[in-house]
Structures are given as C-alpha cells and as structure tokens.
Amino acid sequence: MPPTGEEPSGHAESKPPASDPMSTPGTGQEQLPLSGIRVIDVGNFLAGPYAASILGEFGAEVLKIEHPLGGDPMRRFGTATARHDATLAWLSEARNRKSVTIDLRQQEGVALFLKLVAKSDILIENFRPGTMEEWGLSWPVLQATNPGLIMLRVSGYGQTGPYRRRSGFAHIAHAFSGLSYLAGFPGETPVLPGTAPLGDYIASLFGAIGILIALRHKEQTGRGQLIDVGIYEAVFRILDEIAPAYGLFGKIREREGAGSFIAVPHGHFRSKDGKWVAIACTTDKMFERLAEAMERPELASPELYGDQRKRLAARDIVNQITIEWVGSLTRDEVMRRCLEKEVPVGPLNSIADMFNDEHFLARGNFACIEAEGIGEVVVPNVIPRLSETPGRVTNLGPPLGNATYEVLRELLDISAEEIKRLRSRKII
C-alpha cells in the first residue's frame, strides 16, 4: 500500500525472541565469498535489484545508483517510516548497499557512470529496453569501457521480441506467463497469486544465477557477457508441466482453488477454532496415514479410496470427509494427530504466527538490524545457508546519497571542489 506519511506505531511484543546465534547466518567475521566484487545497481524496485541484494549478502560491494531528486521509487513504496526516504519495503529489500546519486540524463552524469563501470565487475539494470541506449549506455559502449563487465538486464518481456518495449511489472508478468490464469477457484475470477511481486523475485534469482555463471566464465576467459531475463519467462519457467501437457495432449490446466488435479486430499482445510491447515496426500501411503489419523483406516482400503485413481474419481467425497474431520477438531489437534502418523501437514501461518514459531526462531529466520533514523527493524535473514561462508545483512536500505562523496572522492579520485561543483549543478 502507498505510504501514509505517518510513522507506524511500534509494538514491542512483535519483536521475535533472540535465536541461537549458531543458527543465524553471518554472525561471525568470516571472509565472504564475493568479497572484492563490485556491483553497480542502477535499477528501480525489485526486478534485478534483488539480485544485487543477494550478491551483497555474500560480500559483494553494491553501489546503488539513484537520481539525485527522489531516488529509487521503491523508497516510497510500502509502509511509511520515520524516515521520509525509506519505507519498510525499501529498508528490507535494498539491504547491503551504498547509495550514490548520479543524474544519468546529463552528459556529465553519464561520464561519471562510465568511470564507475570501468572499476566494477557487474552492472544490473531493469529499465525498459532502449532506455540505457538513449542515455548513451548501450552494451557495446559499456563493453568497450570494461571488457570484463557482466551486465544483467531484467525487463518485463526481455530485450528482444515484439513486446520488448512494453512496460513490465510483476503483476503483468504473472498474467502473461500463465500464473494468474491458474490462481483462484474453478469458473471464478482469477486472483493475484499472493500479494508479493513473485515475478520480480524469481527473475532476480535467475539473474543472480546467471551472474555467478558469468563470473565463472570470466575467471576462465577474462571476458564479461550480457545476461537477458524477461520477468514473464522467469515465472513461466517454474510452471512445471503445463507446456508439455498442452504440446502433447492439448490439455489446458484450469484453476483448481486450493487443491490439485493430481492428488486428493491436497488443499486447505478449516478447523473447529476457525484456523486453517494444509494437508497434502500425494501418494497412497500418505492417504493411508491420514486415514489412520482420522481413526478410519477402512477409508484406505482397496475397495474404497486406497488407490489414487479411485480418490481422484471420488474427489468431492474424499474432500468432504477431510473437511468434516478437520472441522471437528481444533487446529492444534489436527496438527498433533497428523504429525503422529507422519501425514504432511502445516498451519497456514500469518506473520504473527511466524514471529512466535519455534522453528522460525531456531533457524534464525529473522534478523534484527539497526536502521539509521528509525531503530531496530526485523527483516528476513539470509538464505541460502552456507556452512563455511554464510552471508550476512550489514545494513538496511541506505539514506539517499549516503555514499556519493565517499565513492566519488575515494574510488574515482575526484576532488572535493569538483564534487561540490557537480552537486551545485545537480549532476549528483
């Protein structure tokens, strides 16, 4: 939701208890694997910049290039805080960065940017295709400036194809990729597949993988390369068998609600106390265990529903049996009985549930990080968990331009007088 301009009220009880430090990523002083790698993040919002966040968590130096007036729009997206230039979304997702303000629409700004490119390893951008070229920052120009440069370009539809110039956001990518078509109940309006911009995160994950592969190639050859990711195609890639099912059999998968066309019971069920559980029975053995948890082992007999094909043929009946059983018990009772019989089961957690869940806490899934001008903020911790080189969160989303002077003075060796002149002309 858009920022309100008001500082949200604090709730002391919302802070998760401290976890075992040995289970928390990055609590030591170990050398991080990407130390010495410099990343320029010149994108906005999440699609692409999130890849920079991942690299930063494992030691890369990330320079966030922003327009001097206002910076990344992500700063104003989400829940407002005491800092005018930082929502909670910005603090959480723009972690492990230094902010450098440069106006790329001015020629002197482009010249400064190219000096940074010459001293960097990776460049990440997510503008509409053609924008960088309009600024005089085409791939040939960048490659000539730094032949070892690795450039990740994330856009809604990729750098080629008839739709390349269209605006791209996660919501549109979910629709175009087929994900939104699958979300919702049969015959009803398709719904958002969750409220998070999944496509932006998924595209960034593929982008981060591409960068690591390109770094390996650079080690072997000394050459950089261009990485092109369309948000829609990143989402399409994770939709399992919908492409081969249509290609071979002309089958179009439709919306299935909380269930699955290949298994039953396999969905969300409401307990007597109004809470929800997820139950997944994808094999005959799992259903046999569920029948035992229900204290109705006869349901898993060959004559009734012991065979997957019979359960699928009687989907409504099997689901109704499960609905009635879960509805007769509290969620804790359902969980206990299923876990005793090793039935795959889990609660549908709200964030409040997660803050108090012993497993989240034992795994160190929360990091409490001090944010300048705000105080301590709880954010998701680093994954993946590496045994020898765990990542860490060093800082949350930085104030606008907090490292401009440092980077220009120390990295580019620009005089204090020249920096003052550039600032007066609003180039930085």
Swiss-Prot record:
Keywords: Carbon dioxide fixation, Transferase. It catalyses: succinyl-CoA + (S)-malate = (S)-malyl-CoA + succinate; (3S)-citramalate + succinyl-CoA = (3S)-citramalyl-CoA + succinate. GO terms for molecular function: CoA-transferase activity; succinate-citramalate CoA-transferase activity. One of its GO terms (biological process) is carbon fixation by 3-hydroxypropionate cycle. Residues 1-31 are annotated as: Disordered. Its EC number is 2.8.3.22. The keyword Repeat does not apply. InterPro entries: CoA-transferase_III, CoA-Trfase_fam_III, CoA-Trfase_III_dom3_sf, CoA-Trfase_III_dom_1_sf. Residues 21-31 have a biased composition (Polar residues). It is an enzyme of class 2 (transferase). The active site is at D200 (nucleophile). It comes from the Bacteria. Pfam families: CoA_transf_3. Optimum temperature is 55 degrees Celsius. Optimum pH is 6.5. Gene3D superfamilies: Crotonobetainyl-coa:carnitine coa-transferase, domain 1, formyl-coa transferase, domain 3. Forms a large complex composed of six heterodimers (alpha, beta). Belongs to the CoA-transferase III family. Involved in the 3-hydroxypropionate cycle used for autotrophic carbon dioxide fixation. Catalyzes the transfer of CoA moiety from succinyl-CoA to L-malate to yield L-malyl-CoA. It is highly specific for succinyl-CoA as the CoA donor, however it can accept L-citramalate instead of L-malate as the CoA acceptor. This is Succinyl-CoA--L-malate CoA-transferase alpha subunit. It comes from Chloroflexus aurantiacus.
